[in-house]
Amino acid sequence: MEKYKDKQLSAYERAAALADTLSTEEQAQQLKYDAPAIEKAGLSSYNWWNEGLHGVARAGTATGFPQAIALAAAFDKDMMYRVGEVISTEARAMYNSAAKHGDTDIYKGLTLWAPNINIFRDPRWGRGHETYGEDPYPTSRLGVKFVEGIQGDGPVMKAAACAKHYAVHSGPESLRHEFDAQASMKDMWETYLPAFEALVTEADVEAVMGAYNRTNGEPCCAHKYLMEDVLRGKWKFEGHYTSDCWAIRDFHEHHMVTSTPRQSAAMALNAGC
């Protein structure tokens, strides 16, 4: 029996064994959000893109909860846990139903790009309704319970949550692909990082999504301090780091830190994205 099929091994060991059987081209294909099937291993294609900020209604009928900013206004941690439970239950049901029919299209997977724990500092920001407000403390407390509800506490993760957008991503929306957010270390650690730290160290969130913008001069999807020193170094994050949609393209088209798509991809991969 191939090592990657041995259920006595950990998921990490099986994934590593499978990766060892793939060519460089096959491995690269798996980095796309719409990863193709690996037929020789009997694995179907998988689409990593699913949303779950306040429901999973993009793939059929589902419970639509109020926007995140409205949920947060209740200041109810237990409610946030229950909301997360419902969302992941419905996501799991949709996934199971789709899988029976070989449907691996967008919004059918178990990787939910939620919650958005950015700090809603400026009310003119167009995505503030996705957040839990302007205060890092309730954002942290509510975010932890939401992630715990999404991921569950069973031997197999119910669905995977993703803390986004790391970090200092709170507008201006029209410039998100090119602006450079300048934040002092004091502001970073008092305002913008506490919620991410809580979700990683307390809730064991499975994924973190990098923001489009730069923070203090470096793209958030290839940021040594944020990704290597803080996330994986200080907080010991062991999950996967994903870019926001097509954010790597911004490296050479807007941030001008690289010249070609190949250079941008290499920069992101070498940084751990």
Protein language model features and the residues they cover:
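Glycoside hydrolase catalytic-domain context in secreted enzymes
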Residues: 1-273
